[in-house]
Amino acid sequence: MSDIEDNDGDEYDELSELRQRHKPESQPSVDEAFDLDDLLPTIGEFGKYQKLLVFGICLPACIPCGFCAFNQLFMADTPDDYWCRIPELLDLPLEQRKSLSIPKELDNDELVYSKCYTYGVNWTQLLESGEEDDLTTMEPNASWPLIKCPQGWEYNTSVVWSSIVIDFDLVCDQDIYPTIGLAALNTGGPVGVYLFGLLNDRGGRRLSYFVCLATLLAGSLMTSLSKDFWTWAGSRVIVGLTIPAVYQIPFIISLELVGENYRSFVTVMTCTFYTSGIMLLSGVTYLERDWVRLSYITSLPFYAYFLYMFVMPESPRWLLMRGRLEEALKILERMAKVNGREFPEAVHLKLEAQIRRDKLKKQKKKMANVGLADLCRTPNMRLKTILITLSWFANETVYLGLSYYGPALGTNQYVSFFLSAVVELPSYLCCWYFMDTWGRRWPLSLSMILGGVACVITVMLPDDAVDETLVLYLVSKALLSASFLIIYPFAGELYPTQVRGIGIGASSYIGGLGLIGIPFITYLGKDNLKLPLVIMGFLSMLGGMTGLRLPETLHHRLPQTIEEGEEFGKNWQFKDCCRCAQKPEILSQPASYENLDVLAGSSTNASEVELELRDSRRVREPAPRIDERTPLDTTASGSGRPVHRPSMKRLVRQMSVMDTQRTHDGTMQLTHWI
């Protein structure tokens, strides 16, 4: 029965091909695959237009994005010393006031003034019954009862001048409230990613970005005007809705308009500028320690980004997806003009064919009805989905937890926070190199395991080893930053094209749940400074070990269907996790869509350009069995000739609207999956 179906399919394909041959030349076939990546080598992959876009819009927009994510650490800073406020004794000198009204308690084998208790006596009556000279020599009576601070606290403001902790008295029984506020910020993230993702797809990149800016500024303004904790926490949820959308949207626009050979550069530069913004935040918070003014200052740059309304282009890919051909052509023609290139006239017909084909694809996708359940339907896909999600959860949770915990270490919180950002920069560059030489699995697992070990061994240091603890923390932060950059492309390569968006979305959402819980882990450091590091260290090592079981993707053809995804890595053996990826010998360049040198030639004939843009006719070949050891380029059995995969063009483009940079053998290189 299956043979009959195969024969019918072959006859149908031959008939379809025959019809396509006899179509008029002026009517492009719906089957003709066209992508902007075909056109960019002709009109400029990274010309003047893209440079203005990246360096004038994308990268400047990334700098203050860390402000709204981490300024809360300093807005909710707790002074080192505080004690019960006794209004009746405010006229007395500080030391006399504390010695009379505050009991002492044992802390680390040292007697210190209590932070949460005072003597429960009638101070007004006591003052009226005594003489002024008696007050200077009066000592607390051991029989006086102890009560919790009934009228608030006084604070030592020598380091922390102003914070919500001081204004709202969030200490003692309410000292967990700043942690709740941090969890509220992270709660908004997954919701915002979903909402702005919908707006991004339906309303366009420009509209989504400016709505995101307006939402962030509204939340920041509410933050500054808050008069109680719960209003402040609610405003942080609104700010959290825009994290990380406010960072991702201009990044997406840039990636969609630059050529494939420059997307890795844009990705690394984006991460670098984002980290530079975090470094800048440490200086801003050092100079401005009033939390209300800090909220205003850190939101101020986002007002300037509304000027982008006059210069930020809409994504041509999104316009084509929505069938808005003329608007897309106008942007592409302007890009070619600014780059000093000629725009091929034949592209207009190709774009019309692309729009018709995309509509057919959407109809077929609706009929296919692939969902989240397909990730767990077969055993190998189910195992890989679980492992990817666990590794993602551990990676994202520990990375953010370490970022939050930096100010708590060392002798100066501003210096510690600055150093925690500085160590990310070299880790990105090292990660970029090792990903494309050692593969994805080993750099990911090794960085997470070693980073976890660096956290755990802090428990072996004495309590007074402040500098040594900080050094181990910085080593761990650098390693986790590298792994944080790897997990996105690795997951994107492991999930089959058919369910890639669903898989990445599911893993990132589950990983986002860890961001809500990690503030409560760092809260444990109030009683034991090293306990959060130990917990995050074990979680990081667990995530790194789960990554070893995943199949390597470097130099392997990526799975497209769920069936191929089930086969990929199915024959995994223990020895596979003990070796790095080996680069296969490339006998010749494959016939893939990356070989677009002809488009960059000097041909000016429109018909020639149209032929150059047209796909080569695909030849039906039996689908090979795909497993972890299947290289991208194979040779014909016994012939020694390379068997090219003419379908590579369609294979790669189905992966994402942000196609990943590849080497000449088609291997995916570093990118940031959204």
Curated annotation (Swiss-Prot):
Tissues and organs where the protein is expressed, per its UniProt entry: Expressed in photoreceptor cells.
GO CC term (a single one): axon terminus
Membrane-spanning residues: 54-74, 179-199, 207-227, 237-257, 265-285, 294-314, 386-406, 415-435, 442-462, 470-490, 501-521, 528-548
Compartments where located: Cell membrane; Cell projection, Axon
Cytoplasmic compartment spans: 1-53, 200-206, 258-264, 315-385, 436-441, 491-500, 549-674
GO terms, biological process: carcinine import across plasma membrane; detection of light stimulus involved in visual perception; neurotransmitter uptake; positive phototaxis; visual perception
Residue ranges annotated as Extracellular topological domain: 75-178, 228-236, 286-293, 407-414, 463-469, 522-527
Biased composition (Basic and acidic residues): 614-631
Keyword Membrane: yes
Glycosylated residue positions: N122, N141, N156
Keyword Iron appears in the UniProt entry: no
Topology versus the membrane: Multi-pass membrane protein
Keywords associated with the record: Cell membrane, Cell projection, Glycoprotein, Membrane, Transmembrane, Transmembrane helix, Transport
Main location: membrane
Annotated PROSITE patterns: MFS
Job description of the protein: Carcinine transporter which is required for recycling of the neurotransmitter histamine in photoreceptor neurons of the compound eye. Following histamine release from photoreceptors and its uptake by glia where it is converted to carcinine, required for the uptake of carcinine from glia into photoreceptor cells where it can be hydrolyzed by tan to form histamine and beta-alanine.
Family that this chain belongs to: Belongs to the major facilitator (TC 2.A.1) superfamily. Organic cation transporter (TC 2.A.1.19) family.
PANTHER family to which the protein is assigned, alphabetical: SOLUTE CARRIER FAMILY 22 MEMBER
Protein name: Carcinine transporter
